[in-house]
Amino acid sequence: MKFWKYTWLMLAMTMSLFGLNACQDDDDYSLDKFAIEIMTVVPDGSTYYLRRDNGEKLWPFATNCPGYNFSKTRAQVNYTMLSDSIPGFSHGIKINWIENILTKKISPYLAAENDSVYGTDPVEMLAMAIGDGYLDVRFAANFGNTGVKHLVSLIPTQADNSDPYTLEFRHQAYGDGTLYAAEGLVSFDLSSLPDTKGETVDLTIKVKTFDGEKSYKLAYNSDPACMYSEPDEIISSDDLSKNIH
């Protein structure tokens, strides 16, 4: 199958894993500065806070999205740093905009029904990273402009879970056409994987791409604190967000 290439800057080659470097300097708070980042939305009673992939908790002092319907999810957040640490939080921030990322659990292994339910349609894998206990995946796929919602899933490769750290990314296009390529983001909650007991292991993700079957290895520790890293910033791209589930 032909993959219709797109020319969206080709991810620029100079970008970091999920996009541009920071515009925000923690030592110089200014309302005209901002950063765009993938974070976890954490409900806290009648409100919420944001948790970065380095473990920092951010308190939204102000927001341009007062009607945001929050839940435990991953999200792309454009924010401006307003203050240094406050009790219980690393920084106070202003949310300029926030957009939820499709956030899913690992789906069950269905044996002979894997292909019919989860699909075998190829994708182009653009980026993959683990942060705050989630696998964030940026990918591209062909679409037929029919309005059909595609399904993306992360599934085990063994019925008996004998190899729990090898998973498969699946794409079900439901027979949609191939008029154009679009990209999207999805995050998978990895909390159902076995405890690594403090060890860092290889997490292997198998993917059917337009160039054939490929495997990607990432370092994984079930304790998010052992995986803390400086968060990757991203360019918002919702081409596919309304067409996948």
What name fits each language-model region?
Residues T7, C23-D25, V123, Q172:
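Generic preference for well-ordered secondary structure
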Residues M1-L9:
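Bacterial N-terminal signal peptides that target proteins for export
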Residues M10-M13, R170-Q172:
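N-terminal hydrophobic alpha-helix used for membrane targeting or insertion
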